[in-house]
Every structure is written in structure tokens, then in C-alpha cells.
């Protein structure tokens, strides 16, 4: 009997390590996707097409968390996909939060100091002291994608996401 392949896509800035404690039955083969650097001014559709090249099987299940959920919907346009599972994500731009919709109109997201995330540990330890050390270790482990170029790209793409042809029930 052929095993079902499921690809897991973490959310923005997150590492595939967020899935480390998930357990699946022996009938499922789990594969993890990681964020790749975006090309300058790359559309989310073009990015999804590049990410889709990492999916080698057909009839797969794609699971995406948050912004990863948006990405797997876009990827499903380029691969043979049996099912899409969204976790803490949106199915259409209509479901974006009010702050995201406001950012769309005001471009306020471009003012976010994403370069601070590179040194999040130093900032947190300075502000909160050693009592936050355990939490900082978790941030280092699970939020490993901190390149400001990637973060600015990802935030802009979610704010301006126009939806895609794939319909998620």
C-alpha cells in the first residue's frame, strides 16, 4: 500500500521545527518545507512556483500554518494536490485581519523595523533581563527565518495577497 505524502509548511519566520512534536500514522510520509530567499520583487505566485519544484510526488497533501497556508494555496496551482489543510490561516483576502487590511490601504507595514528581529535575543534580554532566557531560546529554535529582506517581502505579500484560483473548502 502506497503511503500518503504530506508536506508541512511553517508560517512566516518559522522553522519546520515547529512540527517536531506532531505524530502521524505509519500510512503517512511527512516532508518538511523551509522558506527560501525570495527574488527581488518576486510575486507570491512566482515564489510558489519555485517552492513547488521541491514537491516531487503527485497527489500530495499540503499543510500550511498562517502565511505558510497562503503559500500552499498558491503552490497547489502548480502541482497535483489531493488536499490542502490550513492551520491559523486565511482562505481568501476577505479573511485578512483588520490591521492587514489597514496596512493594505496605508502601507504602514513598510514602517515595521524588521531589522530588529535579527537581534531579538539581545533586545529581549536587555529589556526583560535573564528571566526571559528560556523564551528567547524557544524563539531562536522555532523562529529562525529572520532575514529582514525576506520578512519585508513576506509581510508585503500577505498584505497585498489577491487570493488564488484554488478554492479551499
Region locations from a protein language model:
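Conserved serine/cysteine hydrolase catalytic core
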Residues: 150-169
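Short, flexible active-site-adjacent loop segments at beta-strand->alpha-helix junctions, enriched
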Residues: 12, 66-67, 89-93
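Gly/Ala-rich beta-loop-alpha elbow adjacent to hydrolase catalytic centers
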Residues: 63-72
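Flexible "cap/lid" loop of the alpha/beta hydrolase fold
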Residues: 80-114
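Short hydrophobic segments within beta-strands
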Residues: 8-9, 63, 87
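Active-site signature of alpha/beta-hydrolase-fold catalytic machinery across serine-
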Residues: 21, 74-78
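Helix-loop "lid/cap" segments that line or gate small-molecule binding pockets
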Residues: 119-132, 141-142, 158
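Active-site catalytic motif of lipid deacylating hydrolases and related acyltransferases
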Residues: 2-58, 106-117
